[in-house]
Amino acid sequence: RVRVIDVRTPLVPVLGETLGRLTLAAAHEHGVKVEVCPAGVVVECEESGQVRRVTSRDGRAFPADVVVTAIGDMPNTEWLRGSGVALDAQGWVVVDDYARAHGDGFAPGEILAAGDVALLPQSGEYRRMPHWENAIGQAKAVARTLVDGPRETYTPDPYFWTEAFGIAYKIAGPIPPEGEPEVIKGDLD
């Protein structure tokens, strides 16, 4: 038996309301139970270290033999604070279309950033694309900028695919998608 416990409805922030709820329904059909515990949980163990249960802060207890935690990603950029490199409020590195970091005290192109830590300009705002395909594309952009200077901008394709619970997702556009998704093949039922 698998139980997913989250502080908010899982997948909705990533996939949007429609696809997030569709995935949760498919998970439920495959025997996965989902619990929302906004105040968090406490993992309780035996003296031996063996997990006994997980208890929500509102008092609900869930028996458990194994606990796997996945708490998302946070930038490890504390060491950049005060360096002049521009960071957003959460600590992500702000870059331009050539993967060059913004900031003060250094020339454009002296500091570059790629991958999950970089905040990219897209459609008039800065966004993260924490996906392996984007990390590879940004690494190539960094290499081009280092070798040739800022000649070719990096424009990621806002696309990804995955499979979960028998559903194949191919998503193009900003994530989470705003509004209802357009179904090109198949249906949402």
Set out the residue ranges of the language-model regions.
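Mid-to-C-terminal Rossmann-like scaffold of FAD/NAD(P)H-dependent oxidoreductases
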Residues: 117-189
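Short coil/loop linkers at secondary-structure junctions
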Residues: 33, 86-88, 150
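Flexible, glycine-rich phosphate/dinucleotide-binding loops
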Residues: 10-13, 43, 77, 102, ...
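FAD-site-proximal beta/loop scaffold in flavoenzymes
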Residues: 46-55, 61-137, 141
